[in-house]
């Protein structure tokens, strides 16, 4: 089992020459490879895409076997992938998924990091995060609009809709957290983001998500103060330990205007640098003494939350951004760790009630012009949404593509299927140079059960009910998605979430059009269904407006 191979450099093929038998199998092949592009993945030589140890394949032998299998797969066959390892090819039919993926799933009694890590060491499991093991990660852009929407809503609720002269403090510049600086600037706020790894800071600078960096707190605060006084938002990366820095700010009485965190706290061994440790010491001990790392990291997380609670008590809008930091602190004795809310119940849930979430697509041609054309098509088909148009304009101006050109665009039920059909038609008539794939984050309205994140504080108390992502995966399979995934532990770690993903190929064929119509209607409809069942009036009204047949919910 080879987990680390520095000789490997992976990039997705582009253009119209097929390496597999059809676009239905070429698409997952390219997206798997795209997940490991050097500008996309955090540690591609280790198959780690983002989120601590979120991998695209279990090991390099499994990666090679997946690639070779996809190349020979017929359009009436389905490949089964078990925790990043290809385990079977079965005859199905043309409208069935070409790939079905199950990652990191454990029987609930054993669903914890200790048991998972034992399996992982033996080569029997792989942590798939959300879009790492489901082959639809598109770099930091994949989370940037959701982060932007959150920051805009924070500005609306707390500052009258204007973040000019305000600044956000946060931690973590990895694959998810790396979106925060650009999202803050897009929303009109400056951002001070603390990151312990210089390589992560360098990647955000290289890919345009961060404006500048320093290793000196006083210099960082000077840069933030200058940008706020000038009313010109700027993002500053600070090399350091976020728990140390936040405690120092509290001690000095330096108050940010907004406060959150996106370190990989969900994984106390691989995701969070303990206070007083060097990165080199951490990297060594993660392998040689993981329990020592976990103990020290958890203690540091508790200190981190205590500092966040200190600012919360001072009236600073403070929000958990879904990394389970509060839970870790609670388990370390911080009894009031949940005094501040998670970002979904505080700012995002009304969108989920209408099936609105992180719709994304990638151009398999590799040509950025294909994304420009699809951006224009979105504006054409959704003409009366100036907020969406502003997002697309900002994205075109400010977001650098990582790997295959791609776009994230939060739209909901009734729009996703129309856009998918339009993209498919653009492929058919040659307007796009090659097919596109449409997918989404597992963080969506109907595809996840995560009581400390997406389903926190549900109106009916159904936070932990995980039937919903299972139904979502089953329905997307029945509807004909090109690949479907079912994962455990993404975002918040082992034992705290179950979630499903789907991707569908727009190859310009009539058969694809039928699948697209089913999948891109049914997928967001499950989110409306789930929230209507929980009693949200917005979701109930949306279900009625869209004519959903929900017999046990609407009566």
From Swiss-Prot:
Cofactor requirements of the protein: NAD(+)
**Note accompanying the cofactor annotation:** Binds 1 NAD(+) per subunit.
> Could you give a single Gene Ontology term from the biological process aspect?
L-histidine catabolic process to glutamate and formate
- Which pathway or pathways does this protein act in? Amino-acid degradation; L-histidine degradation into L-glutamate; N-formimidoyl-L-glutamate from L-histidine: step 2/3
The GO cellular component terms are: cytoplasm
- Which Pfam families does this entry report, sorted A to Z? Urocanase (PF01175), Urocanase_C (PF17392), Urocanase_N (PF17391)
Write out the residues that bind NAD(+): 51-52, 129, 175-177, 195, 262-266, 272-273, 321, 491
The listed locations are: Cytoplasm
What GO MF annotations does this protein's record show? urocanate hydratase activity
**What EC number(s) does the entry state?**
4.2.1.49
Swiss-Prot/TrEMBL keywords: Cytoplasm, Histidine metabolism, Lyase, NAD
Where are the catalytic residues?
409
Among Gene3D superfamilies, the record links this protein to:
Urocanase like domains, Urocanase superfamily
User: Which enzyme class?
Assistant: lyase
Keyword Cytoplasm attached? yes
Entry's InterPro entries?
Urocanase (IPR055351), Urocanase-like (IPR023637), Urocanase_C (IPR035401), Urocanase_central_sf (IPR038364), Urocanase_CS (IPR023636), Urocanase_N (IPR035400), Urocanase_Rossmann-like (IPR035085), Urocanase_sf (IPR036190)
Q: Which domain of life is it from?
A: Bacteria
Catalytic reactions on record? 4-imidazolone-5-propanoate = trans-urocanate + H2O
**What is this protein's function?**
Catalyzes the conversion of urocanate to 4-imidazolone-5-propionate.
Name recorded for this polypeptide: Urocanate hydratase
Q: Which organism is it from?
A: Stenotrophomonas maltophilia (strain R551-3)
Q: What gene codes for this chain?
A: hutU
């Amino acid at each position: 089992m080879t987990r680390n191979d520095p000789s490997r450099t992976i990039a997705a093929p582009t253009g119209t020459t097929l390496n597999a038998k059809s676009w239905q199998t070429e698409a997952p092949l390219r997206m798997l490879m795209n997940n490991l592009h050097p500008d996309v993945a955090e540690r591609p030589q280790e198959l780690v895409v983002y989120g601590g140890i979120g991998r695209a394949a279990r090991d390099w032998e499994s990666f090679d076997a997946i690639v070779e299998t996809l190349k020979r797969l017929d359009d009436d066959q389905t490949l089964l992938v078990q925790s990043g390892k290809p385990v079977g090819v079965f005859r199905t039919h043309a409208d069935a998924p070409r790939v079905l993926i199950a990652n990191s799933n454990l029987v609930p009694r054993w669903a914890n990091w200790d048991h998972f890590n034992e399996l992982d060491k033996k080569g029997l499991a792989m942590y798939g995060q959300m879009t790492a093991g489901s082959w639809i990660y598109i770099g930091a852009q994949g989370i940037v609009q959701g982060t932007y929407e959150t920051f805009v809503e924070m500005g609306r609720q707390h500052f009258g809709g204007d973040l000019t002269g305000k600044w956000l403090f946060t931690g973590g510049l990895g694959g998810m957290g790396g979106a925060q600086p650009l999202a803050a600037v897009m929303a009109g706020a400056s951002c001070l983001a603390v990151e312990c790894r210089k390589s992560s800071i360098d990647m955000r600078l290289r890919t345009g998500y961060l404006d500048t960096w320093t290793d000196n707190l006083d210099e960082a605060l000077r840069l933030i103060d200058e940008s706020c006084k000038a009313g010109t938002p700027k993002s500053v990366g600070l090399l350091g330990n976020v728990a140390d820095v936040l405690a120092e700010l509290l001690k000095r009485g330096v108050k940010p205007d907004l406060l959150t965190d996106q370190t990989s706290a969900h994984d106390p061994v691989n995701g969070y640098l303990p206070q007083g440790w060097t990165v080199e010491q951490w990297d060594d001990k993660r392998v040689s003494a993981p329990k020592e790392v976990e103990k020290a990291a958890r203690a540091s997380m508790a200190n981190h939350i205590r500092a966040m609670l200190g600012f919360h008590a001072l009236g600073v809008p403070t929000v958990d951004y879904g990394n389970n930091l509060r839970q870790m602190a609670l388990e370390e004795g911080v009894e009031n760790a949940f005094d501040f809310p998670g970002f979904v119940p505080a700012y995002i849930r009304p969108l989920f009630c209408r099936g609105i979430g992180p719709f994304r697509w990638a151009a398999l041609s590799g040509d950025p012009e294909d994304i420009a054309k699809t951006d224009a098509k979105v504006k054409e088909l959704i003409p009366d949404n100036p907020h969406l148009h502003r997002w697309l304009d900002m994205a075109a101006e400010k977001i650098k593509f990582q790997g295959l050109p791609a776009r994230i665009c939060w739209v909901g039920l009734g729009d996703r299927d129309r856009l998918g059909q339009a993209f498919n038609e653009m492929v058919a008539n040659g307007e796009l140079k090659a097919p596109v794939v449409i997918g989404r984050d597992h963080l969506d309205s109907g595809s996840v059960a995560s009581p400390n994140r997406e389903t926190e504080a549900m109106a009916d108390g159904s936070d932990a009910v995980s039937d919903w992502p299972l139904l979502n995966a089953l329905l997307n399979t029945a509807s004909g998605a090109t690949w479907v995934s079912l994962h455990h532990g993404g975002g918040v770690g082992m034992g705290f979430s179950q979630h499903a993903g789907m991707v569908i190929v727009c190859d310009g064929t009539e058969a694809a059009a039928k699948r697209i119509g089913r999948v891109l209607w049914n997928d967001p409809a499950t989110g409306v269904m789930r929230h209507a069942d929980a009693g949200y009036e917005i979701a109930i009204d949306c279900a009625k407006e869209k004519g959903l047949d929900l017999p046990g919910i609407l009566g």
